[in-house]
Amino acid sequence: MKKRICRVLALCLVLCLLLSGCQAIGEYFSVMGSLLMGGSAYRFSDMNYVRPDLERFQADLDACCLAAETERDLQKLLDQIYAFYTVFDEICTAQALSMIHYSKNMTDAYWEAEYQFCSALDGELTAGLDRLYRALAKSPLRPQLEGEAYFGADFFVAYEGESLYDEAFCAMLAQESQLQNQYLALYATVGQMEQATFLENHAETLAEVLAQLVILRRQMAEYAGYDSYPEFAYEFYHARDYTPAQTTAYLADIRAELVPLFQQIAETKPEITLYSCTQTDTYEYVRQTANGLGGTFLQAFWLMEQSGLYDIAAGEEKYAGSFEVYIADYQVPYVFVNPTETEYDKLTFAHEFGHFCNDYASYGGQVGVDVAEVFSQGTEYMSLLYGPADANLTKLKMLDGLCVYVEQGALASFEQQLYTLAEEELNAQGMQALYSRVCTSFGLEGSMEYVLVPHFYTSPLYVISYVVSNDAALQIYQMEQATTGTGRKCLEESLYTSQGYFLAFLEEAGLKSPFATGRLAEVKQMLQQILQ
């Protein structure tokens, strides 16, 4: 029997609604707007890192669970919940700050230790929330808590059954975190040598770590009552409203529809140049994009600029990638990019800025990863129309869009099949053989590069999000091209969504499902016109 699980997708937003009702969000943005204009918002350089106090976390959790059982005064119970959330947010803030500082210098032993300590708390935090919500589900004040002004109708239904977060499962989560940190410690050195040298020295070790993760994750899925790890991850981590089987069918359609186009373009070599690009060029590109888009995008950029909530400088000791993270206690997002110093950096910064805008607009509320990636990739596409005019960059982005379908599709296919490999094949040789087969089927070459994909280690079954969200983002671009202002309006309004499920979000936004019959043929026709 499948154990009941529920991943909290909008914790910060729920916290805001729980304490103050919907009106608080509007008041928050009004206050934030005045802070921006007055230049009074917290700067990143003034943010203080405090190592999480686990004893306080546990004590407040115990007190909150006891209050859920015994308290008859709604306001007193809400105050107790608030006290717990305060500690919870402090830990989330420490996690975000430690990740940012460690990413800025991955040779810094202090920040490495702090990041590893904080990241290892994920399982404990989620288990704590699960325990709290199960206690509230039994509270005599549950009817009031499930009112519209607080958690909402039937919120606690998901917490009435058996909890997954027992000692055994939490131990698995801790083991997973240890393996992830083992990977990141080695991955931190990738920028210190040529990629070929790095792979020669470390590929087999990293492959072994991935194999251990696959074995462990299959055990986790079985323990939770699922037939496969992809099914488990789709629900537990990503809250998807489509299945791994739908993904498999979609990837087969990409192979049939877009891989031949990809191969044709690779042979003809379109006239696209990857120009060099300075940090100033990258910053100016996104600044002009925000000015052109206006509204929420411009407000978010002001916040990012005035509070120093970004790092786009190059560095050999920095994390070799990019991300955006929300800093809960300060109620602001942060963007990190380690640039390649090519024109592609403009798109990368625009991508992470799209995530920044969503977190700014939604008060840090979390949606499903597929929905979140629509905002980032949508901002990339819209930058082509609202940023500085650049025909070469437009072609580069469209080629990149095709590559997302094909190359990220190949990675998604490899990852999904990886969790079906026989245990005797879960080694460097067996995984390489699978990777080569998958790459060949997508018209690509493949060696050991899969060990350089952090998502396989830290965010399992995430990669398909890039593919399906790319399709939605491309639709927003097409909408804007057809009628000026419509795509921009769609993207800005979507930033405020509380709809976490991808297909439901698409319907809400008036967009097609990427799985819709004929959709890939439309994409192929559009890309052919631009790239051939």
Which residues fall in each region the model found?
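Hydrophobic core
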Residues: L13, L17-L19
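Short pre-active-site segment immediately N-terminal to the catalytic Zn-binding motif
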Residues: Y330-F349
